[in-house]
Amino acid sequence: MMLQDKFISLEGKVAIITGAGQGIGLAIAQLYAKYGAAVAMVDVSDKCVEEAGKICELGTKAQAFKCDVTSEDDVKKTVEAVMKAFGHIDILVNNAGIIVRKTVLDTTVEEWDRCMDIGLKGTFLFSKHVVPIMIKEGGGVIVNTASGAAIKGVPDAAPYNAVKGGVAALTRGMAVDFGKYNIRVNCVCPGDILTPMLISEGLQTGKITTGDPQTPEEQAAFDAFISSCGDYRPLQRIGTAEQIAYTFLFLASDMSYYATGGSFVVDGGRCS
């Protein structure tokens, strides 16, 4: 057996992925399933239902779970449902999050709380209820979605910068606390990635007027926005969710068995 075949495999593993209805979360679920994992796809919407069905058609077990990651009761019930459906949990990907493109001066308390609750509190709650299971099972892997914003601030995005910095700090803290239980905890720090969240960012900043261009003018503005997102990084191109998902695969696999507490920057060089 080749080294890559032995280590890049998730055969027999069960992975929970939050925010799995679209974007990076969906790409992670699809890639994990491709490499043998059964995937529990968690989202506040019903988007996961159809996508889980598509994964099952490929011969891998997948199931959608509707959950509000900001509600401890919802999270607890979801983790219990995953255990009932799959029997064990080996991998947790805390990916759910939103972006608010405003400065401290412009951000309302409600916007601040919502960004914090989904991106940071949700990471805390799922970890709180999954880690005891991993301890009983002798170990596990947690991969959190942070951002390049945790390292280099994004202009006019105070809540988002704070949330992602918090996710990176929480990652390090959990790595220290749970290493003795054979639980590895890392985070991935993407840059601008072509996902629905990036489209939301363009709409919030007024750089585009629609995420579904219908006229030549709308398409030109959309293309210019996407192109501009890659202009200021050394690779001079924007990344895709599928490309980012491979870093999550690496961190979930035995290929990274000595890595914990790390922040893995995958941003085309923006933070260089």
Report the location of each language-model feature:
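Alpha-helical segment proximal to the catalytic Tyr-Lys
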Residues: P132, V176-D177, Y257
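Short, small/polar-rich loop/turn modules that mediate ligand/substrate recognition or access, typified
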Residues: G179, R184, A259-G261
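Active-site helix of classical SDR
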Residues: S127, V163, T171
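Residue(s) in the substrate-gating loop at a strand-loop-helix junction
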Residues: S147
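Substrate-binding pocket helix/loop in short-chain dehydrogenase/reductase
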Residues: T103-V104, E111-M116, C229
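Conserved glycine-rich cofactor-binding loop
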Residues: V14, G21-Q22
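C-terminal substrate-recognition "lid" of short-chain dehydrogenase/reductases
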Residues: F124-S127, I135, L235-V266, C271
